[in-house]
UniProtKB/Swiss-Prot annotation:
Pathway note: Porphyrin-containing compound metabolism; chlorophyll biosynthesis (light-independent)
Organism: Chaetosphaeridium globosum (Charophycean green alga)
InterPro entries in UniProt: ChlB/BchB/BchZ (IPR050152), LI-POR_suB-like_C (IPR013580), Nase/OxRdtase_comp1 (IPR000510), P-CP_red_C (IPR042298), Protochl_reductB (IPR005969), Protochlorophyllide_Rdtase (IPR016209)
SUPFAM superfamilies: Helical backbone' metal receptor
GO molecular function: 4 iron, 4 sulfur cluster binding; ATP binding; metal ion binding; oxidoreductase activity, acting on iron-sulfur proteins as donors; oxidoreductase activity, acting on the CH-CH group of donors, iron-sulfur protein as acceptor
Binding sites annotated in the UniProt record for substrate: G434, M435
Cofactor note: Binds 1 [4Fe-4S] cluster per heterodimer. The cluster is bound at the heterodimer interface by residues from both subunits.
Active-site residue numbers: D299
Predominant place of localization: plastid
Name of the protein in question: Light-independent protochlorophyllide reductase subunit B
Keywords assigned: 4Fe-4S, ATP-binding, Chlorophyll biosynthesis, Chloroplast, Iron, Iron-sulfur, Metal-binding, Nucleotide-binding, Oxidoreductase, Photosynthesis, Plastid
Length: 513
């Protein structure tokens, strides 16, 4: 546990609550002190949904500390069972309440005796895992619980559906553009004649989990959640899975070819012929997606060789790095992720597409790297957007964590062929057009930016004279920030505290020497 101003992945209980509140008719009870119960507010504010968040906080207060939690927790579980009539109640502590070292499994066993619904304790180590790891683990735990129970009762139909079908595993609440990605994947599967057996956890029902083995195979769009469940289903029920993320022209085509491979396992036996999706890939790439055409246009060629910095969760950071490098010819000077648990896979995927790799969940390290590399554009999370604003570098948001702007009402997927159009727009609009900025500064107007670009670490020990500020304002905006930082670096090295025009020229000469 650590105290942080900013965390890319939240504490473990948030991941558990995200999974539990994604299912239909599942209620979560959070055993937590006041202050840890912000999930309801966060979800209500960010998700564009009409339903109340099905999470109740069982508050740890002074009375609980004096008498113990059992009575209160059992009472809350029983009450919610009667009021809401859920199929499942998930009990989770938080990292704070875990300090009490209470036997919560015993509370669950006690309450199960008097409850009509199933009750389980989230099996997560709150000190060892983060939000995404906990979400993956909780989803696997729920799937295992119901499938193992169905196997015991001999209530599992292992026969596959008559027509090609798929389970989509990993869409859940508060995900980055996931509602839109889900719609896009549904459309893609419909075009390919593949039926959707189940989507879990988003909108899924725990009573239907026993039917998961009826699908021909599983799809896991994001590495962060779903892989543990897919691995379990493969091991126990022999269900193959596709884990390629269909983001960008190249990977979407690869994804569809993998679907074709698995559909053809049973195609002859079930539908009498083997499928071929090559004509669909060609049609979509050339006529539906504008990205392939755009990447050959003069607009995109203007971006060739531009420097970009990419950072986010492993799925989006890898996909974005590949798209920028191989589909748009943009130089990715650094690709990074905060998913340290997935660092090996991340390095394997991006090593040939970028110059540097950054594996860290410390936002100050990310900010310092951006300030040092001075890219033309940043593609990252909400935090990188803040960093970009302070440095005067444009930023496109491509990964969670994000704020309300990235829960749009309009249709903006990142997956599939429509997603390629969205990404192409985001990339092109993220790069500052240097001449545009320069003209605005020449002619003035409400868009005129501040003369001096702010640096990430504000140097209070350096002052610019009026003359040097005036001289700096004559420099075009797209290189001004770099010149300012180089001048300040030179001044610090020489022990100068007041930057004059002469110091500016001396700094320039020292660089060109």
């Amino acid at each position: 546990m650590k105290l942080a101003y900013w965390m890319y992945a939240g504490p473990a209980h948030i991941g558990t609550l995200r999974v539990a509140s994604s299912f239909k008719n599942v209620h979560a009870i959070m055993h937590a002190p006041l202050g840890d119960d912000y999930f309801n507010v966060m979800r209500s504010m960010l998700e564009r949904e009409r339903d109340f968040t099905p999470v109740t906080a069982s508050i740890v207060d002074r009375h609980v500390l004096a008498r113990g939690s059992q009575e209160k927790v059992v009472e809350n579980i029983t009450r919610k069972d009667q009021e809401e009539n859920p199929d499942l109640i998930v009990l989770t502590p938080t990292c704070t309440s875990s300090i009490l070292q209470e036997d919560l499994q015993n509370f669950v066993n006690r309450s199960s005796m008097s409850s009509k619904c199933d009750v389980i304790l989230a099996d997560v180590n709150h000190y060892r895992v983060n939000e995404l790891q906990a979400a993956d683990r909780t989803l696997e735990q729920i799937i295992k619980y119901y499938l193992n129970d169905a196997v015991k009762q001999k209530n599992v139909d292992r026969s596959i559906t008559e027509y090609p079908s798929v389970n989509i595993i990993g869409f859940f609440t508060l995900g980055f553009h996931q509602q839109h990605d889900c719609r896009e994947l549904k459309r893609l599967f419909n075009d390919l004649g593949i039926q959707i057996n189940q989507i879990i956890p988003e909108g899924g029902s725990v009573t239907d989990i026993k039917n998961l083995p009826n699908a021909w195979f599983n799809v896991v769009p994001y590495r962060e959640i779903g892989l543990m469940t897919a691995t379990f289903l493969e091991k126990e029920f022999g269900m193959p899975y596709v884990s390629t993320t269909p983001m960008g022209i190249v990977d979407t085509a690869k994804f569809i070819r993998e679907l074709q491979f698995y559909v053809n396992f049973y195609a002859l036996e079930k539908i009498g012929y083997k499928v071929n999706y090559e004509s669909y890939i060609d049609q979509q790439t050339r006529f539906v997606s504008q990205a392939a055409w755009f990447s050959r246009s003069i607009d995109c060629q203007n971006l060739t060789g531009k420097k970009a910095f990419v950072y986010g969760d492993s799925t989006h950071a890898v996909s974005m790095t590949k798209i920028l490098s191989r589909e748009m010819g943009i130089n990715v000077i650094c690709a990074g992720t905060y998913c340290k648990q997935d660092s090996q896979w991340f390095k394997e995927q991006v090593s040939e597409y970028c110059e540097q790799i950054l594996i860290t969940d410390n936002h100050t390290e990310v900010g310092d790297m951006i300030a040092k590399l001075e890219p033309s554009a940043i593609f990252g999370t909400q935090m990188e957007r803040h960093i970009g604003k302070r440095l005067g570098i444009p930023c496109g948001v491509i990964s969670a964590p994000v704020h309300i702007q990235n829960f749009p009402l309009s249709y903006r997927p990142f997956l599939g062929y429509e997603g390629t159009n969205q990404i192409a727009d985001l990339v092109y609009n993220s790069f500052t057009l240097g001449m545009e900025d320069h003209l605005l500064e020449i002619f003035g107007g409400h868009d005129t930016k501040e003369v001096i670009t702010k640096s990430l670490s504000t140097d209070l020990d350096l002052t610019w004279t009026m003359e040097s500020q005036k001289e700096l304002s004559k420099i075009p905006g797209f290189v001004r920030g770099k010149i300012k930082r180089n001048t300040e670096k030179y001044a610090r090295e020489k022990g100068i505290t007041s930057i004059t025009v002469e110091v500016m020229y001396a700094a320039k000469e020292s660089l060109s020497a």
